[in-house]
């Protein structure tokens, strides 16, 4: 019913003209990189980086019941989400497993859900399944907007170059219409699970091209870089940010993925509520998302299971990358709760290859 691919090929070609190198992964054209891994990761951690979020999808809800409907079927409270406010929520199955994590943006006359492209089909089908007599109309709006993320400690100052005081006037977890040299776009300021600040730009195609061209040509004294999936993946692992589909999928629940802060325990029923409540009450959480450090450089495409000292399978590596900051291969993975402690050693195994890896608290610090 709902297609996976929402890649805007024209925007991809625009970024290729700016130096992007692309690759096809699971039927989605992704931007791998623009420059070296070191340069892009440096901008993410120390400067300002801009990423084209074409691995995210944009779902639109219209109708008078939209907010109330979201409140009823997802984990977070939506009833008091005001116009131009932003809030993350989780769609969970009857078993309390993650179907998808979405960022909800309230435009008043409609609502946008920003969700991972690989969970888009499941989220849209799940929403569609429960629209029964509600004034809610569901559609894929990925073709209407382009989404960009600006991240790094210099982000706010950098944006002030182009948007003036408007960049400073957007409060946390909200958005507003901004004009920069006659180019209109929506600017959102977000705080993630670790308190890290980032900005989203939502713009129509031609305005997006003008804005980004202006940024690339007038970056001033800032350590600005366009970044691709490779460096952004390193940044996510370093900061312990679970991603779709590696960590956020229906094998795991919000407790295990460490996104339980997106569950409002004071609100009424939602799908999966009873299971999630019991997990906490009866201490039934079996595993946790952890960081892991490898002792040697390995191919980041390799798949590893985790074993205890008796060779019992106790977990799995879900994301793996080389970190220029840590100067090691680091990973995210799910590990048996009793072993998910800083400094614990477990064995990572891939076929005939095995090595000891160390559990690391998240986020990683140099």
Which ranges hold each PLM region?
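Helix N-cap motif at beta-to-alpha junctions
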Residues: 64-65, 116-121, 153-155, 204-209, ...
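Short amphipathic alpha-helices in soluble, non-transmembrane regions
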Residues: 73, 126-129, 161-164, 209-221, ...
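A generic, well-ordered mixed alpha/beta core segment in the N-terminal half of proteins
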Residues: 103, 114-122, 126-139
């Amino acid at each position: 019913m709902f297609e996976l691919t929402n890649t805007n090929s024209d925007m991809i070609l625009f970024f290729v003209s700016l130096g992007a190198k692309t690759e096809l992964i699971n039927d989605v054209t992704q931007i791998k990189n623009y420059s070296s891994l070191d340069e892009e990761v440096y901008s993410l951690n120390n400067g300002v980086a801009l990423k084209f979020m074409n691995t995210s999808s944009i779902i639109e809800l219209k109708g008078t019941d939209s907010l109330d409907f979201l409140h009823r079927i997802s984990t977070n409270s939506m009833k008091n989400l005001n116009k131009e406010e932003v809030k993350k929520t989780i769609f969970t199955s009857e078993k309390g497993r993650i179907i998808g994590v979405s960022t909800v943006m309230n435009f008043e006359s409609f609502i946008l859900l920003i969700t991972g492209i690989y969970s888009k089909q499941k989220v849209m089908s799940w929403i569609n399944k429960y629209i029964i007599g509600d004034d809610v109309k569901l559609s894929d709006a990925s073709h209407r907007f382009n989404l960009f993320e600006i991240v790094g400690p210099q982000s706010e100052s950098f944006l002030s170059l182009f948007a003036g005081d408007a960049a400073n006037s957007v409060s946390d977890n909200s958005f507003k219409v901004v004009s920069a040299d006659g180019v209109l776009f929506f600017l959102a300021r977000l705080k993630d699970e670790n308190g890290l600040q980032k900005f989203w730009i939502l713009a129509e195609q031609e305005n997006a091209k003008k804005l980004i061209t202006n940024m690339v040509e007038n970056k001033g004294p800032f350590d600005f870089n366009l970044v691709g999936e490779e460096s952004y993946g390193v940044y996510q692992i370093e900061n312990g940010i679970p991603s779709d589909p590696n960590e956020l999928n229906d094998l795991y629940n919000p407790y295990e993925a460490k996104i339980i802060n997106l569950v409002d325990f004071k609100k009424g029923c939602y799908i999966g509520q009873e299971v999630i409540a019991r997990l906490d009450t009866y201490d039934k959480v079996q595993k946790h998302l952890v960081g892991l450090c490898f002792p040697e450089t390995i191919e980041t495409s390799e798949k590893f299971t985790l074993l205890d000292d008796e060779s019992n399978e106790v977990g799995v590596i879900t994301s793996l990358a080389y970190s220029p900051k840590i100067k090691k291969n680091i990973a995210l993975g799910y590990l048996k709760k009793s072993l998910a402690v800083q400094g614990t050693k477990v064995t990572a195994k891939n076929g005939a290859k095995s090595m000891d890896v160390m559990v690391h608290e998240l986020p990683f610090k140099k």
